[in-house]
């Protein structure tokens, strides 16, 4: 496949950094977004735990850990389908976590592309164990939230940091939805954490908040404001 001109202008070889991917997707959204999600407001506010996932709380008791990735988003937006469970632990706990999982019947499958490993539950569920060394990790592991099933998940500011660093298409979709649904108090917490740990991402964060609020019809598009004023 030929590299599209808009991509080639930024990265002639087509190899975009996460920040470049994020900026392109934000620009696309700015041009194409329209208010409304296609779902009723009641659905947008619904928080469920309909998809069953392995309960690792008894297995990892005493070890700090949190659910991240797609499953974690159900604490902040409507639940969406995903094929695996991602958890985040401290790098130094990796060996003990693997030993405990294997003792509980989990099977080690392979290493991940990032530091960590893939395990499979006795029921065949894939669990990605991410070994974290983020500068904010210790802080985040003391400020966990609970999802609708009572499982520990990263608080919104740290989940935002992880998804901004990854910046895949589905991550940007999750970000605009979660930020669009967040309260002003939650957004203040996100801004504060991003300002401390990733100040270079502050401009993109504001764009994602704006896009999310337009999607949730919390703010009108600039063109709509102009029409109303005219």
What kind of region is each of these model predictions?
Residues 1-230:
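Compositionally biased terminal segments of proteins
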